[in-house]
Regions:
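Extreme N-terminal starter segment of soluble prokaryotic enzymes
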Residues: 1-3
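Acetyl-CoA-dependent GNAT
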Residues: 5-8, 16-85, 96-98, 102, ...
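Contiguous, function-dense segments enriched for cysteine-driven chemistry
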Residues: 13
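Ca2+-coordinating acidic residues in Ca2+-binding motifs
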Residues: 81, 95, 127, 146
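Conserved G/P- and acidic residue-centered "switch" motifs that form tight phosphate/ATP-binding loops
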Residues: 90-92
Length: 157
């Protein structure tokens, strides 16, 4: 597996991966109307519009793009999706590690994530703590977890 920065021509494939992941993986934890609303939102153009305020990576293997992660400039990992056939194989953990390293270099001392019900355990296993359970403020209210992780401890922590 190789991880590198996203290229502009890959946004359509990333948008497809996002939709497929929501429909196949997240569908176990959310009702169909939420999945329909959530998976319909983002296309390649939406990714391009936010390219200036996000850093993005893809995980690749011989099959092509198998995962995607982004963080914004506010010390938040804002999106991560891993192809259903590559779950629990280290893809998400490796993408998260790359994003965390980037955020640390950006000067962040703590990372925030709004996690789905589906991904909550993954983030907990990677050192994130639940701060609050809330509802996503989209058209369809879906439960999410506001989670944080300290990137490094100083001697007074």
């Amino acid at each position: 597996m190789k991880i590198r920065r996203v290229r502009d021509e890959e946004y359509a494939e990333i948008a497809r991966l996002r939709r497929q992941t929501i429909r196949s993986v997240n569908a176990n934890d959310y009702p169909e109307d939420v999945i329909d609303s959530w998976s319909a939102k983002t296309g390649a153009q939406d990714f391009r519009k936010s390219a200036d305020i996000c850093k993005r990576w893809v995980a690749l293997d011989v099959d092509g793009i198998i995962g995607f992660c982004e963080h914004n400039l506010k010390c938040e990992v804002s999106r991560m999706y891993v192809h259903k056939d590559h779950l629990r194989k280290g893809v998400g953990s490796r993408l998260l590690e790359v994003a965390e390293d980037s955020l640390e270099k950006q000067g962040c001392k703590k990372i925030s994530i709004e996690s789905t019900v589906t991904a909550k355990d993954f983030y907990e296993k990677n050192g994130y703590k639940i701060m609050k359970k809330t509802l996503y403020k989209g058209k369809k209210k879906q439960p999410i977890y506001r989670m944080t992780k300290k990137l490094f401890k100083d001697k007074y922590s």
